[in-house]
């Protein structure tokens, strides 16, 4: 992992926003120009070949290059590069609007939640049926195992940075979001969710937009469910 920007000073008033990125040149300008004041984007380039890193730099984002491919690898690299007390994760494909970050981050900043996840309120065409069905099945398993009232393992989430580091996250694939929830619940975290709009993404999906990608994510999450019994 390498970074091309000096770390900013952590502050309770600033939230680092980690954006795992793989070939999102078409979406990044929209995402980064809508980043609200007080939110500092960290774009983790995970092997892009379309100039995503240069576009991110041109829009003022800190860029971290993570050569090991994998969603969890990119998230972990962003976590290590972040410095703020509270951090957020979100997709870089314009399916989520950075202007909704306040909805997800405020309860964690205020100390009323330890992990806040955005439950996707999907617009037509935003969420393929196979991905939605897989997500609903996974959410039911999480509810049974943790007692939480989670309806969606959503890609926009906020968490205290040091508490996340304490979880000793190990998954470097698509099991990362589930590992965070299960380990956090085991430690007694207050896990909540708020609805956020979910739009059709810009460009071609690498995961949920294909049956193959959904199956690959399901494989990783199934492994996490078995390992964290």
Model-derived features with residue positions:
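Hydrophobic helical membrane-anchoring modules
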Residues: 1-12, 147, 169-229
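N-proximal low-complexity "stem/linker" segments adjacent to membrane-targeting elements
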Residues: 1-33
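Short beta-strand/loop segment that forms part of the nucleotide-sugar
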Residues: 19, 32, 39-47, 64
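Acidic helix N-cap motif at the loop->helix transition within catalytic regions
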Residues: 26-30, 50-59
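A conserved acidic beta->alpha catalytic loop
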Residues: 45-53, 94
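Catalytic metal- and UDP-sugar-binding loop of GT-A-like glycosyltransferases, i.e.
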Residues: 67, 90-92
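Acceptor/aglycone-binding surface of glycosyltransferases and processive sugar-polymer synthases
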Residues: 67-69, 73-81, 99-174, 200-212
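Short aromatic/hydrophobic "clamp" motif used to bind/position activated sugar donors
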Residues: 87
């Amino acid at each position: 992992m390498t970074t091309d920007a000096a770390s900013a000073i952590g502050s309770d008033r600033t939230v680092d926003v980690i954006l795992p990125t793989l070939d999102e040149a078409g979406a990044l300008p929209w995402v980064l120009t809508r980043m609200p004041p007080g939110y500092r984007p960290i774009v983790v380039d995970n092997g892009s070949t379309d100039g995503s890193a240069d576009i991110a730099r041109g829009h003022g984002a800190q860029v971290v290059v993570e050569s090991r491919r994998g969603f969890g690898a990119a998230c972990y690299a962003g976590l290590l590069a972040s410095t703020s007390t509270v951090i957020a994760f979100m997709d870089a494909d314009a399916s989520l609007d950075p202007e909704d970050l306040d909805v997800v981050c405020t309860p964690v900043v205020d100390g009323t939640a330890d992990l806040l996840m955005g439950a996707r309120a999907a617009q037509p065409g935003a969420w393929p049926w196979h991905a939605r069905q897989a997500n609903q099945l996974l959410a039911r398993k999480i509810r049974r195992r943790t007692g939480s009232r989670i309806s969606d393992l959503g890609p926009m989430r906020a968490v205290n940075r040091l508490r996340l580091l304490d979880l000793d996250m190990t998954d470097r694939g698509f099991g990362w979001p589930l590992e965070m929830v299960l380990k956090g619940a085991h430690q007694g975290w207050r896990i909540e969710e708020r609805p956020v709009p979910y739009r059709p993404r810009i460009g071609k999906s690498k995961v949920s937009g294909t049956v193959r990608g959904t199956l690959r994510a399901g494989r990783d999450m199934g492994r996490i469910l078995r390992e964290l019994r």
